[in-house]
Each structure stands twice: as structure tokens, then as C-alpha cells.
A protein has these predicted regions:
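Hydrophobic membrane-insertion alpha-helices, especially the h-region
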Residues: 3-4
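Signal peptide processing junction and immediate N-terminal pro/mature segment
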Residues: 9-26
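Second-shell loop/turn segments in exported
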Residues: 28-34, 48-59, 86-90, 132-143, ...
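Stable alpha-helical elements in mature extracytoplasmic
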Residues: 36-46, 50, 59, 63, ...
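A non-catalytic alpha/beta surface segment that caps or lines the substrate-entry region
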Residues: 42-106
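Solvent-exposed loop/turn segments at secondary-structure junctions
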Residues: 53-55, 84-86, 105-108, 118-122, ...
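Active-site-adjacent substrate-binding region
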Residues: 86, 201, 210-316
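Acidic/histidine-rich catalytic neighborhood of metal-dependent amide-processing enzymes
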Residues: 134-227, 231, 252
Length: 316
């Protein structure tokens, strides 16, 4: 789950500009675009077919194993990062796992962490009926979508030049709740237990699967990772994705990216929060689309192929 900060007038959209042009601009139109939106969609539905992936359930364990198996296939190495939490709702310890996969990591010149949460919300807080609020959500968009993009993307980034190292990070416990103090748990754990070498920057995917996807600039990302955010959204324009990734601000979001920014990893949050099915029982594949997954995957695939030595300190 993510949260809007209404007190910061987050819903006042306005254009974002930086007054500079890229010194590293290439002919992005010629970059290979191999991301398969149909295969990404299959990953979304496979997760949903397992049921609600709430920590402590069989569906959660099956999803962990599904992601880990595919990560092992496509990465040089993969590992589980276990952690636990004494959950206020049950007063019992809940076991959770981050899942990490590395490509070209040790000897790379630039390292990026790509992350998404794989758990789903235990309670449909936004439902109107009190009885429905106690039920878990399926999380087709809020959970499965970001994971689906990354699982398909990692097939293609194996061929990225060795100068770029990639960590695929699937975080758990993002949406446990019900309060903020019991959310974003996997990202917090990862950030507190960083191993060397440290990522140079990060890109978070959250709620990127809805139909007619529009991902604006997230204000916390702009403040904390300005160079990365502007460079990525300029790249979206270069690859004809400006309608999906417009250079204008959206709502301010509390999300996993804040924990990474807190430990010095500039990280951008790619999220479309205008989703009426958020934290309801209607967060199902019916309201998502393969096309949206394809646009996000294409953005990242072309960015990674183009920007193999890019760092947040570079002028871009």
C-alpha cells in the first residue's frame, strides 16, 4: 500500500522542468525493445491464481517460491533475505522474505536496484462494508503488477553490457499494516542490512498495471532523487512514452523508495495512484492490462540498455 500526503497539497499537478538538455542523448528510437507484455501478463495472472499473498499464508509461500525459482533462472545468483515482525493484529510473529537476484553485480561500474513488493494487503480497508474490510485483497495491481514487469524484464537484461550491474529486489511486508509503522517492512530491512557493493540508484515499481496507465512524477522522488527522476522521464519522451510518463507532478506518496533514499540510494517511485480499486476486493486482473505492463517494461529495458554507465551525479 501507499499513502497520499494530502496536507502537502499533493493533488495540485503542475509541469516539471529542469532547464537543461541531456549530454548523453542517443538515438533512443533505435534501441531494441524485446520486452514481451504477454509474458509479463502471464506472470501477473500466475500470482493472482495463487490467491491473496498475505504473509503467513500458503499462497504467500507459493509466491515466494515462484519468484525465487524464476530469479534463479535469469540471474547470476539469487537469495532469500528472511526477517520477521511481531504483528499487532495477531500479537504473533510473521515470517517474511525479501527475494534478491543479481546480474553482473560484483565487477560493474554502475549498479542499479530494481524493486517491487510481492505481498498483498491483509485487509480491504477501502471497502464500504465493514465485513468486506476484514477480507484480504488479491492485489493484481497493488502487488502483482510490479513483480510481473521485473520477472519478464530480467530475461532481457542478462544481455546488458557488463558495465551495468542489476539487483532485482522483491520486497515483502510492504502492505502488512494496518498502520504506517507496520508497512514497508521489507524495504526497511533491506536498507538496514545493505551489503557492499552498494547500489548507485534505484527504481521502484508500484501499481503499474492498471488500464490506461498514467505515471506522473512523484514529488518525493523529485525531491530526493531529482537527477534520476528527470533523466528517466526525459527518456520516456525519447522512446515515445511521454503520454504514459508525463513530465508533471502527481500525488506525494509514502512508499518503499523512501527507505532506500534514507540510506543514500537515490530512488524513484514509478506509480499510478489514480486507481479506484486500491485496497478493495476489486483489485483484480479485470482492471489491469498487458499493454500497461509492456509500457513500463519497455521504459526500463531501453533505459538500462542506454544508460549503462549513468550515475545520479552525472549531468543528464
Amino acid at each position: 500500500m501507499v499513502l497520499q500526503l494530502f496536507a502537502l497539497a499533493a493533488l495540485l499537478f503542475h509541469p516539471v522542468t529542469d532547464g537543461s538538455e541531456s549530454n548523453l542523448r542517443q538515438d533512443s528510437a533505435k534501441l531494441e525493445k524485446n520486452f514481451d507484455q504477454k509474458l509479463a501478463w502471464n506472470w501477473l495472472t500466475k500470482q493472482c491464481d495463487l490467491g491473496c499473498r498475505v504473509p503467513g499464508t500458503d499462497a504467500h509461500l507459493k509466491c515466494r517460491d515462484l519468484i525465487l525459482e524464476e530469479t534463479k533462472k535469469n540471474c547470476d545468483s539469487a537469495e532469500l533475505q528472511p526477517f520477521g515482525w511481531l504483528w499487532s493484529k495477531t500479537n504473533k510473529r510473521v515470517s517474511m522474505w525479501n527475494i534478491l537476484g543479481y546480474q553482473n553485480w560484483e565487477n560493474a561500474k554502475t549498479r542499479v536496484v530494481l524493486l517491487a513488493h510481492w505481498d498483498t494487503r491483509p485487509s480491504a480497508d477501502e471497502e464500504l462494508k465493514p465485513a468486506d474490510r476484514k477480507k484480504p485483497i488479491l492485489g493484481a495491481n497493488d502487488g502483482a503488477s510490479g513483480v510481473a514487469v521485473l520477472l519478464e524484464l530480467m530475461r532481457h537484461t542478462k544481455s546488458v553490457p557488463k558495465d551495468l550491474g542489476i539487483c532485482y529486489l522483491f520486497v515483502d511486508g510492504e502492505d502488512l499494516g494496518p498502520g504506517l509503522e507496520e508497512m514497508f517492512l521489507g524495504a526497511v530491512h533491506y536498507s538496514k542490512h545493505l551489503k557492499s557493493p552498494k547500489p548507485d540508484y534505484g527504481i521502484l515499481l508500484d501499481m503499474v498495471g492498471k488500464k490506461d496507465l498514467v505515471v506522473p512524477v512523484e514529488p518525493n522522488s523529485l525531491e530526493l532523487a531529482r537527477g534520476l527522476t528527470l533523466a528517466l522521464f526525459r527518456h520516456a519522451k525519447e522512446v515515445d512514452l511521454a503520454k504514459t510518463f508525463p513530465m508533471e507532478q502527481g500525488p506525494t506518496i509514502l512508499d518503499d523508495h523512501l527507505s532506500l533514499n534514507d540510506v543514500g540510494i537515490p530512488t524513484v517511485d514509478l506509480i499510478d495512484f489514480e486507481y479506484p480499486q486500491w485496497h478493495t476486493l476489486k483489485d483484480t486482473p479485470e482492471y489491469c492490462s498487458a499493454e500497461s505492463l509492456g509500457k513500463v517494461g519497455t521504459l526500463l529495458e531501453t533505459w538500462l540498455k542506454k544508460s549503462t554507465v549513468w550515475k545520479p551525479t552525472a549531468k543528464f
